[in-house]
Amino acid sequence: MQWFKTLLLATGIAAVSAGAQAKQTICVFDIVGKSGDVYALMKDYQLAAKNWGADIELKVGTNEAVIAEDFKAGKCDGVSITGMRGRQFNPFTGSLDAIGAITDLKLAVKVMQGLASPTFAKAMVNGKYEVVGVIPVGDAYLLVNDRNINTVAKAAGKKIAVLDYDEAQKIMASQVGAQAVSSDITNFGAKFNNGQVDIIGAPAAAFKPLELYKGLGTKGAIVNYPILQVTGNLIIHPDKFPTGFGQKSREWVKAQLPRAFGILGKMKADIPQKYWMEVPAADKPGYQKLMREARINLTAKGIYDKRMMKLLWQFRCREDAKNFECGLQDENYK
């Protein structure tokens, strides 16, 4: 009988231990902390995850570099960070932010809905990391402190903020002859606002929280031509979560995409019309070619993932089969 009591006790201890280990910590990057939109969405996610057997604790922070390092060190079981920062954990999804690769927010939502399919489940896993959701943060636009900077040639010699961990931005700045000023996501807005840089790239979602109207002043403008899509990634250590968690998570995130599309559209619409500067229709093909050449160059250097570049080329040509690039094969990677 004693062995039976011992077995019961051991089973009880094991059950308590399993319960104690069940809580997962997700570290959330939100540039404005607990009052931000990302944190609000993650609170909804936290609630939904209970249905998939996870008991998530959220830790919000405003320093994305620290959050990414904590994730690597195992201090967080999951993270919510930008796609550019997430590229180190999964180059496939981390290449959604490739320059000119997703032409607008509508296409971004279509792509992200497609990626939530079980067909792409294997591509979501990279070593000990799994991407369990990709969300749009919006089109990134160039903001200039002087409307006269209205062509690529006029960007030469100007100071442009580049994220210090994104090689793609440094290379692009060099190609147009601009002076790259190393920055991070927490200070690039302030550098623009206080005149340390002349040009930044940012989504409409950053306009209000970072008070970018201060940097625009009376002479500046937002160039109404998306240069890339900013994305958010949810990434986990899958061994810390229940089996099958990743796919359930991706499907939940997919269901939130129309909501995100509406919110981001409103954020753009809320920016006063006076700040927008249109790009002449005749100039657009030139910009498209410039971004395409840069993208191919960056893919050759291994910065962007070939599988994703091919997929996005296919998506773009499905949207607009008459586009000149659809007759070319240099992004149809084998």
Residue ranges and their predicted role:
Residues 1-8:
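Bacterial N-terminal signal peptides that target proteins for export
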Residues 9-16:
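Hydrophobic alpha-helical targeting segments used for export or membrane insertion
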Residues 71-81, 178-179, 194-203:
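Alpha-to-beta junction loops
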Residues 27-107:
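Extracytoplasmic small-molecule ligand-binding "clamshell" domains
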Residues 72, 82-175, 212, 226-333:
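Contiguous mixed-secondary-structure segments that line small-molecule binding/active-site clefts
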